[in-house]
From Swiss-Prot:
It is an enzyme of class 5 (isomerase). Its main location: cytoplasm. It comes from Ehrlichia chaffeensis (strain ATCC CRL-10679 / Arkansas). Forms a cylinder of 14 subunits composed of two heptameric rings stacked back-to-back. Interacts with the co-chaperonin GroES. This is Chaperonin GroEL. The gene is groEL. The keyword RNA-binding does not apply. Together with its co-chaperonin GroES, plays an essential role in assisting protein folding. The GroEL-GroES system forms a nano-cage that allows encapsulation of the non-native substrate proteins and provides a physical environment optimized to promote and accelerate protein folding. InterPro entries: Chaperonin_Cpn60_CS (IPR018370), Cpn60/GroEL (IPR001844), Cpn60/GroEL/TCP-1 (IPR002423), GroEL-like_apical_dom_sf (IPR027409), GROEL-like_equatorial_sf (IPR027413), TCP-1-like_intermed_sf (IPR027410).
Length: 550
């Protein structure tokens, strides 16, 4: 491999081309009338989706320079997706427009540093203006509206998510699973719990696309101890491996030889295992492990106070659950054992009595947290369909809608369909600039703010975006939107065309910040196959042209 430094016009041209290709692929999914994208795979049927993040992540150009640029954009999209689980499409549309306009200004000889200052100054003003537009989400109907919009107008998805929120509360645990049946969408309330601890190694991941650990019918080992060596749990590991079921270990910590051995067993396929730290600290950790034991039917939480040793545990003494879902930050236990309901209720009553007896506000607060986790349960959205392609596409939309709903509950909502960004134009009219080039940066953001609504209208098959934008700005009503489903103007909140503030805010913030990175990017160093690499590849293939350096 050889290093090549790409600079100047060649770099600018490549950035424009890659951004345009990504925006074309992702932008077509925007809005309720957006189109789907088929993502080809090395095996099996292509995946059909409207998930902008999945689309952008799947684009891997062969050209090393284009790939480097695409990777920078994908990394930013990934951060946006991690923050709110939605907004990638809006982020891509905004980024593409800012970069397009900056390229024109650069070609005209403008000072790029001053342009960047203007763009960043405008960004802060827009973010402040967005905050002033928000409205809290209070009713079940409003929750359904947010979910429906994010699910591309699917009212069934919206109503089911609202039902889940009603079942488990606004702070409750809601998960999405694929169903074995043909029913499009169903809601199931079950016992369960979520706590803020993620997997101790990414090598435990079973779903690499979403970086999740997903187990069905696992055994659960609970201990207050720190596991440094593998010897104490070897008998358990051997018994679990023979059973063919997965194992989740919840301990004070798992490190050193114990962690490396578990990872090695997982990678070799001998044992489906994952480890997480126990929630809480001190006595609170002890209590929460006790709660998990009650929920999962575990007979023991191994500790120094307990006479029974870890190596003496049988499979019947371990906890179990229907499903386990672990991210890098959280662990969700879904579905308790069949005979645990009475024990769970008894534990709930015990915690309630402790709350009444406690004289400490701090202790009461922590007890209420435990009560909420144990009594709230888990709402499971089961997604079905007549084919695998249909199920996966619907599941993507359900997950996007769920992320959007959580964001809306957290920070409130703003007028949807790109209208909120459009209405921030007014604050930029009065924004003072130091010079003409800084003003040029502010004007670039002005044009970018119109890009999402233009794309949504274009995807509906209409060419009337300029007229729609002019009418919205003329009315001086920041709750007015254009509904592409009815092709009419309406009030955002009465018609339900609303977006979570958090999604709009973060998508805009990330888009402008990413564009700012490209503004002052003067060179990219990429690896390209050298002639020697090509010859070496060809030499081993007996006249078949080599393997292109692989």
């Amino acid at each position: 491999m050889a290093n090549v430094v790409v600079t100047g016009e060649q770099l600018d041209k490549s950035i424009r081309e890659v951004v345009r290709i990504l925006e074309d692929a992702v932008g077509c999914t925007a809005g309720p009338k957006g189109l789907t994208v088929a993502i080809g795979k090395s095996y099996g049927a292509p995946e059909v989706t409207k998930d902008g993040y999945k689309v952008i992540k799947s684009i891997k150009p062969e050209d090393p320079l284009a790939l480097a640029i695409a990777n920078i954009i994908t990394q930013s999209a990934s951060q946006c997706n991690d923050k709110v689980g939605d907004g990638t499409t809006t982020c891509s549309i905004l980024t593409a427009k800012v970069i397009e306009e900056v390229s024109k200004a650069k070609a005209a000889g403008a000072d790029i540093v001053c342009i960047k200052e203007g763009v960043l100054k405008a960004k802060e003003a827009v973010l402040e203006a967005l905050m002033s537009m928000k409205r809290e989400v209070l009713s079940e109907e409003e929750i359904a509206q947010v979910a429906t919009i994010s699910a591309n107008g699917d009212k069934n998805i919206g109503s089911k998510i609202a039902q889940c929120v009603q079942e488990v509360g606004k702070d409750g645990v809601i998960t999405v699973e694929e169903s074995k049946g043909f029913k499009e969408l169903d809601v199931e309330k079950t016992d369960g719990m979520q706590f803020d601890r993620g997997y101790l190694s990414p090598y435990f991941v079973t779903n690499s696309e979403k970086m999740l650990v997903e187990f069905e019918n696992p055994y659960i080992l609970l201990t207050e101890k720190k596991l440094n060596i593998i010897q104490p749990i070897l008998p358990i590991l051997e018994n679990v491996a023979r059973s063919g079921r997965p194992l989740l270990i919840i301990a004070e910590d798992v490190e050193g030889e114990a962690l490396s051995t578990l990872v090695l067993n997982k990678l070799r396929g001998g044992l489906h295992v994952a480890a997480v730290k126990a929630p809480g600290f001190g006595d609170r950790r002890k209590d929460m492990l006790g709660d998990i034991a009650i929920l999962t039917g575990a007979k023991h939480v191994i500790s120094d106070d307990l006479a029974i040793k870890m190596e003496d545990l049988t499979l019947a003494e371990l906890g179990t659950a229907k499903n386990i879902r672990i991210t890098k930050d959280t662990t969700t236990i879904i579905g308790s054992v069949d005979n645990s309901s009475a024990n769970v209720q008894s534990r709930i009553n015990q915690i309630k009595m402790q709350i009444e007896a406690s004289t400490s506000d701090y202790d009461k607060e922590k007890l209420r947290e435990r009560l909420a986790k144990l009594s709230g349960g888990v709402a499971v959205l089961k997604v079905g369909g007549s084919s695998e392609v249909e199920v996966k596409e619907r599941k993507d939309r359900v997950e996007d809608a769920l992320h959007a709903t959580r964001a809306a509950v957290e920070e409130g909502v703003v007028p949807g369909g790109g209208a909120a960004l459009l209405y921030t134009l007014s604050v930029l009219e009065n924004l003072k600039s130091k010079n003409d080039d800084e003003q040029l940066g502010i004007n670039i953001v002005k044009r970018a703010l119109q890009a999402p609504i233009k794309r949504i209208i274009k995807n509906s098959g209409s060419e009337n975006a300029p007229c729609v934008i002019a009418h919205l700005l003329k009315q001086n009503d920041k709750e007015l939107i254009f509904n592409v489903d009815t092709m009419n103007f309406a009030n955002a909140f009465t018609s339900g065309v609303i977006d979570p503030l958090k999604v709009v805010r973060i998508a805009f913030d990330f888009a402008v910040s990413l564009a700012a990175v490209f503004m002052t990017l003067n060179a990219i160093v990429v690896d390209v196959p050298s002639k020697d690499d090509a010859n070496a590849g060809a030499g081993g293939m007996g006249g078949m042209g080599g393997m292109g350096g692989f």
